[in-house]
Amino acid sequence: VDYDNTLKAYSINNGDEIWSIKTQKSSIRSQKKLSLAIKNEKIYFNNSLGDISSVDINNGNLIWQIPTQSSLAFDTGFFLKTSDIVVEKNALFFSNNQNEFFSLDAQTGNLNWKQEINSNLRPVIINDLIFTISMEGYLIIMEKNTGNIIRSNYLLNKFKAKNRLKIRPAGFIVGNKNIYLSTNIGRFLVIDITTGKARTILKIDNKKISRPAIFNKNLYLITDNSIIKLN
């Protein structure tokens, strides 16, 4: 998906364009990379205006398209930041920094449910639970089928009160016992999944660090100039 809200497919053999599909353009470019997900020969993607589209992967034909923002927000794409789209069974899950968390039917685009959560981080789905972390630093666990909030825990208690407003979650993953959270100030939190309290806070950098990744039982973080491996 390019900056003009056009989805393009290319041949991996020669690089030729196979098909493209345009969605509505905004005169202001989004600050965040756009997301796409693939399942059952369908591509699901968002554009900078908040529209969610479903496209046939073989020919680029549009199956459905759903707006998530009102027409009054036509040129606020610069301010809209949407999370990665996660496809789980027959539903799409995503959220944004406009205090909206959506579940859509993957076949029709119809709304399953909507919840008021302010987050542009990729949600994590485990069995019937959705894990997300808000921009304000709350761990939120929801029921996948209904969107009902089961639990909410504030994660920044160990930081000084005057510093908390400066801290923004940058990305997280969920392990067997812990949740691993990176931040925009270079701090890395290990959170007890049962209590929702931070076990450990590590200083990795003074700037934003990447969403954690796990490979061969090791955890990796990326900073501006390095890749950091944690056991």
Features from the language model and the residues they span:
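Residue-level marker for isolated small/hydroxyl-bearing positions within beta-strands
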Residues: V1, N46, S95, I133, ...
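A generic tandem-repeat structural signature
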Residues: V1-T23, K33-S35, F45
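Surface-exposed loop/turn positions within WD40 beta-propeller blades
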Residues: D4, L49, Q98, E136, ...
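WD40 beta-propeller blade core
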Residues: K8, E17, S53, L62, ...
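Short loop/turn segments that connect beta-strands within beta-propeller blades
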Residues: S11-G15, D56-G60, D105-T108, E143-T146, ...
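Extracytoplasmic beta-rich repeat domains
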Residues: D16-N40, N61-K89, N110-N127, I149-I173, ...
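C-terminal closing repeat unit and adjoining cap/tail of repeat-based domains
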Residues: T108, K177-N178, T183-N231
